[in-house]
């Protein structure tokens, strides 16, 4: 309607000129038709129409629950029961009939519940799918259930899910709290925020256009990335760390472990590590246009150069040095930004 409305109005105006001899009733009909078209064109500003959906499914405590949504937010909470409670609201600012173009399906299998948002073709939409309808989900699952979330446009918030968790959206924020088996948290356009997360194996979190923040994170391996946004981590413990950032600062506050490997790459942004009593590390740091500073006494070229190495480390743009027993490996590269290794 956005593209066709001007042509419809122009056609009506031309018809009015050529039919100047017609009576007033016909002119009124044309006027009403134009007004109706304008109202349809501005339908997005109409009052919101809603339709509610509710469903409860009995499952085992270790069930798997997946939710696939097109547009709308998803909120999932781990509960104490043995059922999946699904509350959903369809929303549109178009005609109420558009709500029927979107269907919510719930498939039950042995130990598994699959929830999907599906579009249906409707004559009133001339074959288009119900893209103007969003669906917001509020779901409670057994705390030990595993959860898999996917959405095209909408934010996700997950709290208290103790089973494995994967949450991915194209446009929207991803927020998790108290999720000890988090595996994946990703957004293309939106922030990713993790609190009290952990993983038995590797954990991956990333955003293309947004920041990644984490607090109280525990994992064997962390893979984090952002194209345009900061990566800020506090109270973090891991054996392996890989961070890639194109445009944004990186801050890591936490522990490094004996034998651990930690690699941070940033094209345009500063990197700051704040470490709590590290046993030791071997450092390789490079910055094309920035300084490198360490609060730890680094050894560059041998014990006798300890003090001199520390001073030089603050000015050099590329250093290889050791602190303590040198058991961990720390590699930091940034093209444009400072590198700071601070004591906590």
Task: Mark where each language-model region is.
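Intrinsically disordered, low-complexity terminal regions
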Residues: 1-344
């Amino acid at each position: 309607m956005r593209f066709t409305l001007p042509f419809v109005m122009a056609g009506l105006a031309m018809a009015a000129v050529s039919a100047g001899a017609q009576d007033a009733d016909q002119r009124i009909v044309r006027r009403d038709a134009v007004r109706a078209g304008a109202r349809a064109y501005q339908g997005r500003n109409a009052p919101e129409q809603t339709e509610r959906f509710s469903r409860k499914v009995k499952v085992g405590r270790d069930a798997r629950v997946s939710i696939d949504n097109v547009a709308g937010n998803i909120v999932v909470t781990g509960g104490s029961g043995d059922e999946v409670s699904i509350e959903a609201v369809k929303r549109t600012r178009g005609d109420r009939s558009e709500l029927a173009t979107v269907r919510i399906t719930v498939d039950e299998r042995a130990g598994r519940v699959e929830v999907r948002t599906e579009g249906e073709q409707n004559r009133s939409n001339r074959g288009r799918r119900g893209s103007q309808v969003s669906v917001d989900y509020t779901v409670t699952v057994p705390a030990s259930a595993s959860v898999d979330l996917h959405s095209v446009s909408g934010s996700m918030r997950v709290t208290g899910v103790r089973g494995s968790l994967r949450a991915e959206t194209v446009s929207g924020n991803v927020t998790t709290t108290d999720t000890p088996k988090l595996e994946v948290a990703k957004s293309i356009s939106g922030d990713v925020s993790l609190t009290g997360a952990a993983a038995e194996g590797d954990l991956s979190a990333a955003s293309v256009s947004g920041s990644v923040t984490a607090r109280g994170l525990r994992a064997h391996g962390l893979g984090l990335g952002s194209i345009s946004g900061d990566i800020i981590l506090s109270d973090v413990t891991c054996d392996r760390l890989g961070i890639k950032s194109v445009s944004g600062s990186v801050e890591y506050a936490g522990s490094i472990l004996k034998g651990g490997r930690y690699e941070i790459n940033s094209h345009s942004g500063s990197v700051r590590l704040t470490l709590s009593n590290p046993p030791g590390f071997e450092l390789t740091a490079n910055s094309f246009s920035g300084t490198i500073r360490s609060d730890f006494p680094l050894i560059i070229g041998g014990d006798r150069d300890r003090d001199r190495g520390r001073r030089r480390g603050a000015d050099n743009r590329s250093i290889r040095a050791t602190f303590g027993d040198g058991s961990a490996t720390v590699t930091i590269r940034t093209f444009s930004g400072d590198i700071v290794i601070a004591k906590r």
